[in-house]
């Protein structure tokens, strides 16, 4: 009995130590797994993708939407778009005025590329400038019709104003192309009318009709 007791006591103590070690390992594993889950959840919210290796994480890819938004302010975007849009249409007006009968001018004015590019730019500006109050400003009267006061409030935003400018550039260039093509078809001078279409589109259209009427009366 004494010898058995002498052996069983160390064995019991060893088993107890082993059990405590196993329990500690299990606790560490549970803590590690919870850390990994928490890290992964934090990464999902933060917009990062992580790869877990030996209880550590490495940022592989991070969204830059927040950073990108801080690079340019609304005023800077509106100013840049205003300048880019204005500069983009000037070569077409220059060709129609300086060399209206040149082949390069005819080919450029037949192209739909500038209208597509400016149209996409307009859609982008419309998207980022749209607010819940936009429709309310557009149809502010009790008859669901536009009112001057509502339109003035809507265009108080620089981004909305920039989108309206791109809208005008597209419409003016399209009208100038119509005047230019009609002048080529009927052998009518259109340089003055095309020039007016750049900033005073309705005046340019009227100028073309008046010029056309004068030329037709001379040949009668």
Curated annotation (Swiss-Prot):
The keyword Lipoprotein does not apply. Keywords: Chloroplast, Membrane, Plastid, Transit peptide, Transmembrane, Transmembrane helix. One of its GO terms (biological process) is xanthophyll metabolic process. Disruption phenotype: No visible phenotype under normal growth conditions, but mutant plants accumulate violaxanthin and completely lack neoxanthin. Its main location: plastid. It comes from the Eukaryota. GO terms for cellular component: chloroplast envelope; chloroplast membrane. Pfam families: ABA4-like. It is a multi-pass membrane protein. Expressed in root vasculature, root hairs, leaves, trichomes, sepals, stamens, stigma, pedicels, siliques and embryo. Residues 1-37 form a transit peptide. Induction: Induced by heat stress. The chain crosses the membrane at residues 77-97, 112-132, 154-174, 195-215. It is found in: Plastid, Chloroplast membrane. InterPro entries: ABA4-like (IPR025461). Plants over-expressing ABA4 have increased levels of trans-neoxanthin. Required for neoxanthin biosynthesis, an intermediary step in abscisic acid (ABA) biosynthesis. Probably not involved directly in the enzymatic conversion of violaxanthin to neoxanthin. Cannot convert violaxanthin to neoxanthin in vitro. Required for ABA biosynthesis in response to drought stress. Required for neoxanthin biosynthesis which is involved in photoprotection of photosystem II (PSII). Neoxanthin acts as an antioxidant within the photosystem PSII supercomplex. This is Protein ABA DEFICIENT 4, chloroplastic. It comes from Arabidopsis thaliana. The gene is ABA4.
């Amino acid at each position: 009995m004494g010898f058995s007791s002498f052996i069983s006591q160390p064995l019991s103590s060893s088993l107890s130590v082993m059990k405590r070690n196993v329990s500690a390992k299990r606790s560490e594993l549970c803590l590690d797994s919870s850390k990994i889950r928490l890290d992964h959840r934090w990464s999902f919210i933060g917009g990062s993708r992580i790869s877990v290796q030996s209880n550590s994480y490495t940022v592989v890819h991070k969204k830059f939407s927040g950073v990108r938004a801080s690079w340019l302010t609304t005023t800077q975007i509106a100013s840049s778009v205003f300048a880019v849009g204005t500069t983009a249409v000037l070569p077409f007006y220059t060709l129609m005025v300086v060399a209206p009968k040149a082949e390069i001018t005819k080919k450029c004015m037949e192209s739909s590329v500038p209208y597509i590019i400016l149209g996409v730019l307009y859609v982008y500006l419309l998207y980022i400038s749209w607010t819940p109050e936009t429709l309310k400003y557009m149809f502010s009267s009790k008859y669901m019709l536009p009112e001057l006061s509502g339109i003035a409030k809507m265009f108080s935003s620089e981004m909305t104003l920039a989108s309206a400018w791109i809208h005008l550039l597209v419409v003016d260039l399209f009208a100038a192309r119509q005047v230019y093509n009609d002048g080529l078809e009927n052998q009518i001078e259109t340089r003055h009318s095309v020039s007016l279409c750049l900033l005073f589109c309705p005046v340019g259209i009227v100028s073309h009709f008046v010029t056309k009427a004068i030329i037709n009366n001379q040949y009668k």
